């Protein structure tokens, strides 16, 4: 979802029930007095009619936005789907005085929050007075990943006579990025180390020398270049002291076939969210295990566009940092997967992205695809990716009854296994890598 800068929102002013009744009575008196030629009655009717009109004009002429200060904080942000987010909104006058603070406390306040962040439940907030106004405290539990606005603040106020009311949106919305939920216990260390052993692509029995080398990447220390291997392989090679378990990993998130999938809760939408969660969980788990990881979106999502070509690769840049910043780089890529907005600029079509990955694997790289493609035609462009990689694994999420993806991938030398929505990811991972528990 795209957030646009919030501009001033005109107040919506209307008469209350009391104001409507008074306006009706005044109109009746004015018309009746005129018809029976009683000027005093007609004048009284005009005065009565003027009261709600003046109240309406008074509220309309004094918008609340410029006179009110709104501050909103969210914790944590970004958040994972299903994770509680605490929101505190502080409301008070721009120029605090005893009268303006009291007036701000008398406002009826509400928050504009998308259903994706609160479900179908009515949002309840704890309202507390503060020295400068009022604070609202409430908790959100995002159900869907995405980029969602929290706010603006909805206010309702009345004139002193209670004849008119004005509703107005005040303050700008605060963006909340919701990452996909991460599955717990995704990948055992045993499975990762036994299955992800780097070796030179095309070599059945890699030498000890080759298993301790990898392709040179921008920023590597030139003192680690192994010149003999560089001459033999025709490209710069550097020594790695991190051992065989530190093979670089390319995770391909392939949900292009589910772009724009149905309403929340539909079968295709649930499959989309599950596929994204599986890919994110695998990428983060392997990063935490010490593997350099890059995450490539086959749908050419906008989040990937800014990272393409950063170090000569067809996909996203390599992430090596195991801290929160490294996690954020990977997880931010998944937020918009399968949710392409109309007219959005994308990095390329699925065929463009996958064809750019053909032959793009470096020495010792592991390719792991998490795909929702099920037919042979959909799977074929993915099956030819990573032909020069040392290992290729695929986790296939079945979307319909078509079950051609796994056989197609196996025919092209992949290790592949199905993983239905809600399935056991650790068990599927062990089937792929031969890990034990």
Language-model segments: what does each one mean?
Residues 50-310:
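An amphipathic, basic-hydrophobic helix/alpha-beta surface used to engage anionic
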């Amino acid at each position: 979802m795209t957030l646009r800068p919030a501009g001033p929102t005109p107040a919506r002013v209307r008469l209350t029930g009391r104001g409507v009744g008074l306006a009706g009575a005044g109109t009746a008196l004015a018309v009746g007095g005129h018809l029976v030629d009683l000027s005093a009655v007609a004048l009284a009717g005009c005065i009565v009619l003027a009261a709600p009109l003046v109240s309406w004009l008074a509220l309309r002429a004094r918008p609340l936005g410029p006179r009110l200060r709104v501050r909103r904080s969210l914790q944590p942000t970004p958040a994972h789907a299903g994770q509680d987010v605490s929101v505190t909104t502080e409301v008070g006058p721009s120029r605090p005085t005893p009268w303006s603070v009291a007036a701000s406390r008398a406002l009826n306040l509400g928050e504009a929050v998308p259903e994706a962040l609160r479900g179908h439940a009515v949002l309840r907030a704890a309202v507390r007075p503060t020295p400068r106004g009022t604070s609202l405290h409430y908790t959100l539990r995002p159900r869907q990943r995405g980029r969602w606005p929290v706010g603006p603040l909805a206010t309702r106020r009345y004139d002193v006579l209670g004849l008119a009311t004005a509703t107005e949106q005040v303050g700008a919305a605060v963006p909340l990025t919701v990452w996909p939920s991460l599955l717990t216990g995704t990948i055992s260390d045993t499975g990762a180390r036994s299955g992800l052993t780097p070796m030179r692509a095309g070599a059945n029995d890699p030498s000890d020398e080759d298993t301790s080398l990898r392709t040179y990447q921008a920023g590597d220390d030139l003192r680690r270049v192994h010149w003999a291997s560089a001459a033999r392989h025709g490209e710069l090679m550097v020594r790695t002291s991190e051992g065989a378990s530190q093979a670089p990993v390319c995770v391909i998130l392939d949900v292009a076939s589910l772009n724009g999938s149905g309403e929340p809760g539909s079968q295709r939408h649930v499959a989309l969210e599950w596929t994204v969660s599986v890919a994110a969980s695998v990428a983060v788990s392997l990063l935490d295990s010490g593997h350099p990881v890059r995450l490539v979106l086959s749908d050419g999502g906008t989040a990937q566009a800014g990272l393409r070509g950063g170090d000569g690769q067809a996909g996203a840049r390599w992430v090596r940092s195991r801290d929160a910043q490294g996690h954020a780089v990977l997880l931010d890529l998944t937020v918009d997967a399968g949710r392409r907005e109309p007219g959005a600029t994308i990095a390329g079509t699925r065929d463009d992205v996958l064809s750019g990955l053909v032959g793009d694997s470096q020495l010792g790289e592991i390719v792991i695809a998490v795909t929702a493609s099920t037919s042979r035609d959909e799977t074929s462009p993915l099956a030819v990716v990573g032909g020069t990689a040392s290992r290729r694994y695929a986790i296939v999420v079945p979307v319909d009854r078509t079950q051609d993806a796994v056989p197609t991938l196996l025919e092209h030398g992949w290790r592949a296994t199905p993983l239905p929505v809600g399935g056991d990811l650790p068990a599927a991972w062990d089937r792929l890598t031969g890990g034990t528990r």
